[in-house]
């Protein structure tokens, strides 16, 4: 019953979108000299994109926003749709405790959310790093084993955060009995967190 094919399409579409942004990040320093002097902020930020680790961090943050909303949608499909309204009365007829069904569905949603973001990031960074070994856009940095390790850690960390945001949003949406609120809360929360992480990242680099 769960639209796995639709989820895979979302993952591939998101991966294509994030890959495009990743290449854009890598291209920004090359156009720094062409940016009008009046755009001081852009000039200040451009050097940030001169290393792979920062690009990976920014892409992972954006991926977290996308998959926080994805996670909320998965929780909507697995939890809110089944435990609110008429479908809940159907669950009462099952010989299994509702709490057990709820727990299994919640764990499944968490695993699916984390796996989806990890798969997406794997596609994005594998393709990006591979092309960088052939036609490097980032000057002054190199692909290394430690880079893959750091990228993997970032992807895992942010995928867990995205799933946690989806879980929190689901709890709020469950109380309000609204799938729309679940999605809105997940988007708002993830955007707020991403802005805080971006500011923190820039502060560390400075």
Q: Model-found features: residue ranges?
A:
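Residue-level recognition of transmembrane alpha-helices
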Residues: 11-12, 105-106, 186-187
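Secretory targeting signals
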Residues: 18-29, 36-73, 104-170
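Transmembrane helix boundary and interhelical loop/hinge segments in multi-pass membrane proteins
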Residues: 73-90
């Amino acid at each position: 019953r769960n639209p796995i094919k639709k989820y895979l399409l979302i993952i591939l579409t998101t991966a294509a979108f994030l890959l495009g942004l990743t290449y854009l990040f890598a291209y920004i320093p090359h156009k720094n000299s062409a940016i009008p002097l009046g755009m001081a902020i852009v000039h200040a930020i451009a050097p940030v994109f001169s290393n792979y680790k920062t690009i990976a961090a920014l892409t992972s943050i954006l991926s977290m926003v996308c998959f926080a909303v994805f996670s909320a949608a998965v929780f909507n499909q697995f939890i809110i749709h089944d435990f609110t309204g008429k479908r809940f009365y159907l669950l009462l007829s099952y010989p299994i405790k509702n709490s057990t069904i709820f727990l299994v569905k919640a764990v499944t949603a968490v695993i699916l959310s984390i796996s989806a973001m990890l798969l997406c990031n794997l596609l994005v960074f594998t393709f990006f790093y591979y092309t960088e070994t052939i036609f490097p856009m980032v000057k002054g940095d190199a692909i290394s084993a430690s880079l893959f390790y750091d990228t993997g850690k970032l992807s895992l960390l942010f995928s867990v955060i995205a799933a946690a945001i989806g879980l929190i949003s689901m709890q709020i949406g469950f109380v309000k009995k609204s799938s729309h609120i679940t999605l809105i809360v997940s988007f708002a929360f993830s955007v707020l967190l991403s802005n805080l992480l971006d500011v923190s990242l820039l502060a560390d680099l400075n």
